[in-house]
Amino acid sequence: MEENQFERTALLLGKASVERLARKRVAVFGVGGVGGFVCEGLVRAGIGAIDIVDKDIVALSNINRQLIALYSTVGKNKVDVLEERLKDINKNLIIKKYKCFFLPETSDTFDFREYDYVVDAIDTVTGKIELILKAKEAGVPIISAMGAGNKLDPTAFQVSDIYKTSVCPLARVMRRELKKRGVEKLKVVYSKEEPIKPQFEEGEEVVPGSVSFVPPALGLIIAGEIVKDLIRVE
């Protein structure tokens, strides 16, 4: 019998579901610590087409948590590195990459009606809000990542509606901004862990702390939610 790379997945999901995933197209906005692992989980599960969106360059400080960050990839475009990796996982994958940050001024680049699912793994509130509004306007399912920085407990993540979240500072801001814009619901993954205060030396740049095992957990939870949603028979 010919070997199939998705045969173990088919044992769990069923052959029809694996075939269904191969016909789906997902767009992942932001491919850093969270988004990179979303892509990894989706492609290894058998998603047939993926769009990846990010303007960032791999930096040395990314190595502690980002899938695509290695000494050999520092200085390269994240979407270029990720494209090569994902094509090496599934040679039949259809992949489209965009070297831009998603913001109101770049949003017209994308036709959201082409997507079966959208992932918000963006860092900025402005970008997140714009992406959510565009996906909602197009009637496309979207799942949004809340804060993964300043956290140590990968088991504290929960899948919820944005208006049922608590603790997470980013979720609090998003609730307020989405309510202003009339967004009634949004599927998110957020942490119930109280944020840890980073330990800065005087004069250091103020950025969130991060660790190797938290952003990947968030990304893989999101990938799992998407796969489960997409294989449900309509």
Where are each of the predicted segments found?
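Conserved S-adenosyl-L-methionine
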Residues: 43-49, 137-139
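Conserved N-terminal Rossmann-fold NAD(P)-binding element of oxidoreductases
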Residues: 28-30, 53
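Conserved SAM/SAH-binding loop
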Residues: 99-107
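Glycine-rich phosphate-binding loop and adjoining beta1-alpha1-beta2 segment
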Residues: 47, 52-89
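N-terminal charged helix/coil linker that caps or initiates catalytic domains
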Residues: 1-26
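Hydrophobic/small residue at the entry helix of a nucleotide-binding pocket
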Residues: 34-35
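Glycine-rich phosphate/adenylate-binding loop
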Residues: 2, 110-117, 122-127, 137, ...
